[in-house]
Amino acid sequence: PDLLKFAKISTMLVIVATIGQASTGLARNSGYDVAASHAYAAQLGLVACIAIVALVIMSKSENKKLKGMSFGLATIWLIQYGLGEMFSGMTWISLIHAVIAMAIFGHALALMRVIAAEHAIHSE
């Protein structure tokens, strides 16, 4: 199977989950009861990040940048998830939480380019 293709799809899922996280996070701060949706999207994103790491390793790619970026995405999502769980009652944490989310979004977009380039090399 083409594991890098599945890693790319999982990265797309992380990007969509990040956008969903942003919308539910903003809605939560506006008084809507979307805490469950925010938590489920965070869990889905975490599983997708772990899947990306597993798929990249299983693809046997020698690209160190691809491996490093996939581990980096999973690590920062895990940190973000931990911050969300630990400080859910503190409103000031959203200042840090939002900045990390923007970094995750940018990192996932960059990872998409690296996966696409590596996939193009392997599919030739």
Describe the function of each predicted region.
Residues 1-124:
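Polytopic transmembrane helical bundles with strong interfacial aromatic enrichment
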